[in-house]
From Swiss-Prot:
Xref: InterPro entries: aa-tRNA-synt_IIb, aa-tRNA-synth_II, aa-tRNA-synth_II/BPL/LPL, Anticodon-bd, Anticodon-bd_dom_sf, Pro-tRNA-ligase_IIa, Pro-tRNA-synth_IIa_bac-type, Pro-tRNA-Synthase_IIa_type1
Subunit structure: Homodimer.
Signal peptide: none
SUPFAM superfamilies listed in its UniProt record: Class II aaRS ABD-related, Class II aaRS and biotin synthetases, YbaK/ProRS associated domain
Compartments (UniProt record): Cytoplasm
Gene name of the record: proS
Enzyme Commission code(s) on record: 6.1.1.15
UniProt organism field: Shewanella baltica (strain OS223)
UniProt name for this protein: Proline--tRNA ligase
Entry's transmembrane regions: none
Lineage: Bacteria, Pseudomonadati, Pseudomonadota, Gammaproteobacteria, Alteromonadales
Superkingdom: Bacteria
Family, as annotated: Belongs to the class-II aminoacyl-tRNA synthetase family. ProS type 1 subfamily.
């Protein structure tokens, strides 16, 4: 490709409304342009990267035995009514009527459509197992789209759905998809971690997320220092204390704490050990009989709302109770709440159950109890794992301790079981002629999100540093004063021809532009390998080569450059 015949569209200035580096660089590198909130057009450079990501995803899915199909983005609402998600999904589901007043949705996901397709097309166990995938546009009407392609309303996704009669083949397909996703991200040259995950709104049993590691990642990953164990912070299991509860050494006493509205203020003002304090959080209960529930964690710990969401007593999704409701029921407000004398159900974290001589709110404004001990001052409450893990704690596999990393979720695989097939009556006849409900798996990759995540992991102050496999161009040719030197023109054109014939994606900057601008553009768009051609190089019989990632420069003799670049591009 010649720059003179290409829409390069680079920008010097960082757009003011772009918050994260991937959004900034995708705009500056001329990859995307905003059409409306959360909606973007791909320019040539961005589309080249997107198509390379898509190609790797497609190749690995095909290798894993999945079959490509394509389903409509527009879906009939009656399928969503059938599964109950018409009401459950919320405002992210964009609903509309056609000219005949029939309800439709713009698909944020395709479980309903694929299940409807399979129940009509598959009738016998002989047709199973089956794994179908598509690469299709999705639309989710996010309340606040942000971070460019990281959280846009319209995005490109690979979603696959598998169908089975038995758990064994479902497990085999799940493992195949796990391996395929690992291969996809490995081929793209990205540092990543597969992690145990919560099944979320889609539901099901087993679930793994695939995270590209990046400091800007929204998700916190807890992983073992001694094994492959890793989990999303929402899913990571807290260790059950092995040490017995300590004996009481303090008397219970009521203390005035007028200026201690938070744990931090309480600890500072009274010189307390934060591990000897607890936080009492009041959430909405699951029934009229238990309208409020108290969840108690240690002062230095954080409530894990995903874990709390699974408690029978707690309404789903977890909702913090309004202060007015708390005051009406307890007589005090947040900052002064605690377990003694509390007339609502209490659930405490495992770590709280072994505490002694601890401090908590007294359920009277501006007062706390110090020296609280279980059994002596109040009965032990229901115990559960309801907190986030912290670094240094032992991991559940016993092979190490927790460490933390930030990640960007780009893939998610689920075992759905019969969540959709049962509600949609997707059945087949087994070997005995008996009707059986299908088991399902679901496997998603955010194709457009991978592009943004790759940038978040690979950039410097000059621009993007693309991994080889997904770079828009592998080699950039920079001819100095090309329009004034026939020698430079001839050699640049010959190299351009040779690289094209070798099947290498190459960008020849044939503009009448200053060298500084040409260098800046090549570095901004992240081309891995750059070759500079000038009269001085020609006199010396060498090309000047620069590696974008390492910054290393080399002089390569004319007759060695093509082989050198072929090897460099292969990695």
């Amino acid at each position: 490709m010649r720059v003179s015949k290409y829409l390069l569209s680079t920008q010097k200035e960082t757009p003011a409304n772009a918050e994260v580096i991937s959004h900034q660089l995708m705009l500056r590198a001329g990859m995307i342009r905003r059409n409306a909130s959360g909606l973007y057009s791909y320019l040539p450079t961005g589309l080249r990267v997107l198509r390379k990501v898509e190609a790797i995803v497609r190749e690995e899915m095909n290798k894993a035995g999945a079959i490509e199909i394509l389903m409509p983005m527009v879906q009939p609402a009656d399928l969503w009514v059938e599964t109950g998600r018409w009401e459950k999904f919320g405002p992210e589901l964009l609903r509309f009527k056609d000219r005949h007043n029939r309800d439709f949705v713009l698909g944020p996901t395709h479980e309903e459509v694929i299940t409807d397709l399979i129940r009509k097309e598959v009738s016998s166990y002989k047709q199973l197992p089956l794994n179908l995938y598509q690469i299709q546009t999705k639309f989710r009407d996010e309340v606040r789209p942000r971070f460019g392609m990281m959280r846009s309303r319209e995005f490109l996704m690979k979603d696959a759905y598998s169908f089975h009669l038995d758990v064994d083949t479902m497990n085999e397909t799940y493992e195949a998809m796990y391996n395929a996703y690992s291969n996809i991200l490995t081929r793209m040259g990205l540092a990543f971690r597969p992690v145990l995950a919560d099944t979320g709104s889609i539901g099901g049993s087993m679930s793994h997320e695939f995270h590209v590691l990046a400091q800007s990642g929204e998700d916190l990953i807890a992983y073992s220092t001694g094994s492959d164990y890793a989990a999303n912070i929402e899913k990571a299991e807290s260790p059950v204390p092995t040490e017995p509860r300590g004996a009481a050494t303090e008397e219970l006493r009521l203390v005035d704490t007028p200026n201690a509205k938070t744990i931090a203020e309480l600890v500072e003002q009274f010189d307390l050990d934060i591990t000897k304090t607890v936080k009492t959080l009041i959430v909405v209960g699951a029934s009229e009989a238990t309208p409020l529930v108290a969840l108690i964690v240690r002062g230095d710990h954080e409530l894990n709302e995903v874990k709390a969401d699974k408690l029978d007593l707690v309404a789903s999704p977890v909702e913090m109770a309004p202060e007015a409701l708390i005051r009406d029921a307890i007589g005090a407000g947040p900052g002064s709440l605690g377990p003694i004398g509390l007339n609502i159900p209490i659930v405490i974290d495992h770590s709280v159950s072994v505490m002694s001589d601890f401090a908590a709110g007294a359920n009277v404004d501006d007062k706390h109890y110090f020296g609280i001990n279980w059994e002596r001052d109040l009965p032990t409450a229901q115990v559960a794992d309801i907190r986030n893990v912290v670094e240094g704690e032992p991991t559940p596999d016993g092979s190490g301790t927790y460490a933390m990393a930030r990640g960007i979720e780009v893939g998610h695989i689920f075992q759905l079981g019969t969540n959709y097939s049962k509600s949609m009556n997707a059945t087949v006849l087994d070997e005995n002629g008996k009707s059986q409900v299908l088991l399902m798996g679901c496997y998603g990759v955010g194709v457009s999100r991978i592009v943004a995540a790759a940038i978040e992991q690979n950039f410097d102050d000059r621009g993007i540093i693309w991994p080889e496999a997904i770079a828009p161009f592998s080699v950039g040719i920079l001819p100095m004063n090309m329009h004034k030197s026939h020698r430079v023109t001839d050699i640049a054109e010959q190299l351009y021809k040779d690289l094209n014939e070798a099947g290498i994606d190459v960008l020849l900057d044939d503009r009448k532009e200053r060298p500084g601008v040409m260098f800046a553009d090549m570095e901004l768009i992240g081309i891995p390998h750059t070759v500079v051609i000038g009269d001085r190089n020609i006199d010396a019989g060498v090309f000047e080569y620069k590696n974008r990632r390492t910054g290393e420069k080399q002089d390569i003799p004319f007759d060695q450059l093509l082989d050198f670049l072929k090897n460099a591009v292969k990695g």
